[in-house]
């Protein structure tokens, strides 16, 4: 069926007629829901894959995302703000673009946008970390003393926690770190512990008894757990007889994160400071290749996290990001009184592509993260500093999108862009019915009800990184459903036609969020496009999706298109659309550049 319609693609030279809001002519296509073929560009299957050109090795490197100049990177580790400088530590392979030989890379910044790359902060040079300096955290002790606690692996791959201090705290960059002579300071001792599943310590916090607390990801008697430890001095740790929280229906929890949040207040909270009345806590874990979380309270009497809602089926747990995003780490930014979170976005091309490129992995744009006013979910938004890269703004108002309409967003660099668009629903009467079972696998639903399948309200959204003839394009869009007395919005990022290149992962990512359409008819979408990295924020940050895309058009042609579209029965208005070309940031460039 896919190839049966591929022959139609050559006639769709969109540049010849997509110069206004509407298509002047159509080609009938029953696969497009009988709409006269207006949405053919969304439903026609791409022709056979083609091999990448030699330019692939350079064209997919991002312009304003955090990544080292070369080689492999993965988890963010120990981000902090200290003495006027932001520090980003990260898992790094000095020797190549594949996983292995992991050390702690280290970069510094004054604005979270431009970064200076330094020598690694931690390398594998002691018996307790010879297998790798794995993920960890930074805690700033009283008196302004930062301390790293990280997981090390020994020659037998047993895991334990280690400590390191800055050699010279007067150095603004904190270039050199000294490991504690008594490392490791914490081993997986005790009944029911698994010595090869004991890693990724959190930032520490002080409890009501004045003792430090810390959680470590692990397994306890076969349960996944955020194991809880106490210390008077941050050097000598004692295991608490119960975990901070555990669950018997999931895999081992990596990279746990624990922090306080105030409903409806985007100000950050320092977990070691006095927590105000009404605050909630978030417990995040990396599991099943994604980052999930729970909202609840930290019961000081029990010294335990208590979720507001206990959900046994982990497929229903909330997600930080519904795309290629893992091993996130947050920190309290005392500079601007906010909590910031980073995540690792892996490559989804082939290992041979990574070897050709000479690099693999990046970190998402730093995001402010806070709790929604109803206390049910976390919201995220790119830090305001990233807007300093905006240039060449274009703006449109009062656009009306009927079924099958495209509107081209011109005069911005389609490979490096920031697009903010607001969709206003003329009516909500046409919303299709919601099936609660879709919550178990929103990605599957995005794949089945793609942008080519018309609905009552939606799909509507953006088509990005589109080639001239639309044989390559990525769709980021919404669908609206009615669920009893509320409305559910599905946000999708569909990569299935994103590239003609072979050996790529091209899924359809997706997530649902509740939205009170009786009160507010406007749904916002912000998409940041940075060559092979796309980050989208729907409904004011209710759903976030990070995607990795590798269109051949980027390497072969050097131009692409961005469109707003609607393929639903209900008319959608666009009261405001703004887009900017994004300038290149200075990220871990060659020595000699300095912004400090």
UniProtKB/Swiss-Prot annotation:
Cysteine pairings via disulfide bonds: 446-492
Molecular functions (GO terms): fructan beta-(2,1)-fructosidase activity
Secretion signal span: 1-20
Activity regulation: Inhibited by sucrose.
Family annotation (PANTHER family): BETA-FRUCTOFURANOSIDASE, INSOLUBLE ISOENZYME CWINV1-RELATED
Family affiliation: Belongs to the glycosyl hydrolase 32 family.
UniProt protein name: Fructan 1-exohydrolase
Organism this protein belongs to: Aegilops tauschii (Tausch's goatgrass)
Lineage: Eukaryota, Viridiplantae, Streptophyta, Embryophyta, Tracheophyta
């Amino acid at each position: 069926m896919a190839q049966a319609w591929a022959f139609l693609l050559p006639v769709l030279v969109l540049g010849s007629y997509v110069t206004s809001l509407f298509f002047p002519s159509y080609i009938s296509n029953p696969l497009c829901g009988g709409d006269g073929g207006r949405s053919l560009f969304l439903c026609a299957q791409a022709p056979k894959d083609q091999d990448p050109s030699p330019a692939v090795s350079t064209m997919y490197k991002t312009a304003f995302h955090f990544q080292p100049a070369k080689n492999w990177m993965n988890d963010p580790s120990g981000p902090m703000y200290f003495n006027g400088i932001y520090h980003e530590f990260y898992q790094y392979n000095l020797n190549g673009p594949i996983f292995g030989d992991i050390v702690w890379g280290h970069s510094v910044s004054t604005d979270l946008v431009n970064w200076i790359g330094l020598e690694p902060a931690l390398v594998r040079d002691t018996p307790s970390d010879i297998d790798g300096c794995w993920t960890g955290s930074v805690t700033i002790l009283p008196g302004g003393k930062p301390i790293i606690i990280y997981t090390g692996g020994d020659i037998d791959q047993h895991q334990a926690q280690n400590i390191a201090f800055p050699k010279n705290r007067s150095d603004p960059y904190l270039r050199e770190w000294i490991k504690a002579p008594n490392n490791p300071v914490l081993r997986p001792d005790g009944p029911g512990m698994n010595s090869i599943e004991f890693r990724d310590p959190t930032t520490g916090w002080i409890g009501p008894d004045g003792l430090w607390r810390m959680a470590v990801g692990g397994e306890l008697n076969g349960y996944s757990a955020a194991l809880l430890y106490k210390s008077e001095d941050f050097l000598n740790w004692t295991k608490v007889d119960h975990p901070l929280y555990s669950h018997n229906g999931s895999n081992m929890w990596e990279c746990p994160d624990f922090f306080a949040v105030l409903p409806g207040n985007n100000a950050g909270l320092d977990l070691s400071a006095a927590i105000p009345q009404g605050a909630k806590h978030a417990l995040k874990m990396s599991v099943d290749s994604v980052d999930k979380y729970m909202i609840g309270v930290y019961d000081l009497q029990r010294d335990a996290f208590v979720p507001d809602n206990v959900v046994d089926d982990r497929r229903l747990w909330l997600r930080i990001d519904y795309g290629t995003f893992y091993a996130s780490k947050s920190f309290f930014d005392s500079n601007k009184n906010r909590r910031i979170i980073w995540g690792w976005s892996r490559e989804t091309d082939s290992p041979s592509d990574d070897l050709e490129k000479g690099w693999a992995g990046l970190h998402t744009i730093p995001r402010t993260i806070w709790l929604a006013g109803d206390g049910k979910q976390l919201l995220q938004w790119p830090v305001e500093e990233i807007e300093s890269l905006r240039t060449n703004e274009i703006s449109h108002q009062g656009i009306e999108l009927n079924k099958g309409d495209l509107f081209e967003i011109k005069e911005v660099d389609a490979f490096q862009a920031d697009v903010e668009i607001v969709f206003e629903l003329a009516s909500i009467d046409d919303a299709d019915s919601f099936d609660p079972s879709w919550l178990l696998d929103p990605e599957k639903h995005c794949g089945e009800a793609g942008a080519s399948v018309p609905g009552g309200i939606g799909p509507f959204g953006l088509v990005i990184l589109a080639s001239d003839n639309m044989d390559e394009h990525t769709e980021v869009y919404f669908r609206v459903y009615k669920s009893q007395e509320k409305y559910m919005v599905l946000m999708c990022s569909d990569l299935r036609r994103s590239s003609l290149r072979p050996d790529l992962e091209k899924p359809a990512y997706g997530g649902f969020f509740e939205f009170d359409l009786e009160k507010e008819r406007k749904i916002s979408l912000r998409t940041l496009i940075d060559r092979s990295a796309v980050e989208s924020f729907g409904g004011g940050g209710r759903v976030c999706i990070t995607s990795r895309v590798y269109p051949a058009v980027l390497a072969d042609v050097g131009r692409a298109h961005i469109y707003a579209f609607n393929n639903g029965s209900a008319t959608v208005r666009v009261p405001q659309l703004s887009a900017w070309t994004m300038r290149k940031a200075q990220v871990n460039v060659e020595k000699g550049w300095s912004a400090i």
